[in-house]
Every structure is written in structure tokens, then in C-alpha cells.
């Protein structure tokens, strides 16, 4: 098992289960309000020869006690002059920090959304409003939908909703289906994605592997 002192990247580190440090300033983990994370690997090919994978990673830590979130970026090598295994190691270090913080702060971040749900009747995520009865209101025009009428799919950074349309029973129905694309929406999940997935699993019975 990794000790908390191993969760360190440049000027950011997890000191223990209650404290993080950034640029020699310490913050309480209980004051974390949101976490953002993304890790992307890109295959690098030079003259048709596979050179390995270049990795990028991003971590955002929002705090009650800091006016601006903490941002940690590793943008990858973008060059053949570095061993690509090194880029994976650096990205994995940031991912390990995220996973540890996500574990330590999961309940308090869930409680933030549940508090809004209790007071407003919905929780807000990625500018959309989610109601326990299955209604979702997106910020775009005509953005009020019933989640049960949509197919959900997921990528590493987004959830997509695509309208489920009944199979047409007439020739004209088939023509109309080809002419009109199903309504679709996207929800970016890089911030508090673990919490969002837990909430829609609980309220909408939607889950992935």
C-alpha cells in the first residue's frame, strides 16, 4: 500500500488523510468541494513505426478556503526525445493522487449535491438540472427531457443522451426517420464524475460496468 507521502507531484502532495499541501500552503481535505480529473493516452507513430504512447493528465481541486481551484497539469512529452514510459509514470502519479482524494472526499461531495436536491428538488451537474422523477432540464432551448426516453452512452470524458425513437411502421415514417436525426445531449463528466455516476445509478438506474 502506498503511504500518503507517496502521493506527491511537484508542488502538490497529500500529507495525510486530513491535509494536502500546495506550494507550501496547507489545506484541509474536509474543505474540498469538487474534484476534476482527466487522463488521456495517445499512440505516437513516426514514419509508420509505433513509438509508444504519450500521456497527459489533469487534476483540479476546488476548495472552500481558496478563491481559485488548484490546477495540476501534465501535458505529455510531445516529442520523440523522451522515453514514453516516463510520461505514463507521471500521468499515473497524478491519477493516483486523484483516486486517493476522490476516496477521501466522496461522501462530502455527494452531500453537496444531495443538499441542493433536498432544498431545490433537483441537483445541478454540468449546468443541467436532474430531478429524481427522471426529468432533466438542459440549458439549451427545448432542453426539458424524460431520461427514460433516451439511450445513455459513455466515453472517458462525457455521457451522451440520444433520443429513443420507435421503429416506424409506414414508408413515410421511414422517410421522416432518415430526415430527422434523434435529439441528443452531452454531459461533460470530468468534474465530480464519480459522484454523478453514483447519483444517476441511484435515481435513474443507469450504470456502466
Where are these regions (language model features)?
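Conserved beta-hairpin
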Residues: 1-36, 106-149
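Acidic, Ser/Thr- and proline-rich intrinsically disordered linker/docking segments
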Residues: 35-114, 148-209
Amino acid at each position: 500500500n502506498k503511504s500518503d507521502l507517496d502521493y506527491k507531484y511537484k508542488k502538490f502532495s497529500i500529507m495525510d488523510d486530513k491535509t494536502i499541501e500546495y506550494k507550501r500552503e496547507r489545506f484541509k481535505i474536509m474543505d474540498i468541494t469538487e474534484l476534476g480529473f482527466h487522463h488521456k493516452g495517445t499512440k505516437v507513430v513516426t514514419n509508420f513505426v509505433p513509438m509508444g504512447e504519450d500521456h497527459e493528465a489533469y487534476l483540479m481541486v476546488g476548495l472552500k478556503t481558496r478563491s481559485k481551484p488548484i490546477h495540476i497539469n501534465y501535458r505529455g512529452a510531445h516529442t520523440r526525445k523522451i522515453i514514453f514510459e516516463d510520461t505514463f509514470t507521471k500521468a499515473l502519479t497524478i491519477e493516483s493522487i486523484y483516486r486517493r482524494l476522490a476516496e477521501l472526499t466522496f461522501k462530502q461531495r455527494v452531500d453537496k449535491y444531495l443538499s441542493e436536491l433536498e432544498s431545490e428538488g433537483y441537483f445541478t451537474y454540468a449546468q443541467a438540472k436532474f430531478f429524481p422523477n427522471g426529468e432533466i432540464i438542459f440549458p439549451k432551448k427545448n432542453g426539458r427531457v424524460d431520461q427514460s426516453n433516451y439511450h445513455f452512452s459513455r466515453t472517458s470524458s462525457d455521457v451522451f443522451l440520444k433520443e429513443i425513437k420507435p421503429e416506424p411502421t409506414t414508408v413515410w415514417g421511414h422517410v421522416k426517420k432518415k430526415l430527422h436525426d434523434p435529439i441528443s445531449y452531452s454531459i461533460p463528466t470530468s468534474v465530480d464524475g464519480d459522484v454523478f455516476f453514483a447519483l444517476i445509478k441511484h435515481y435513474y438506474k443507469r450504470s456502466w460496468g
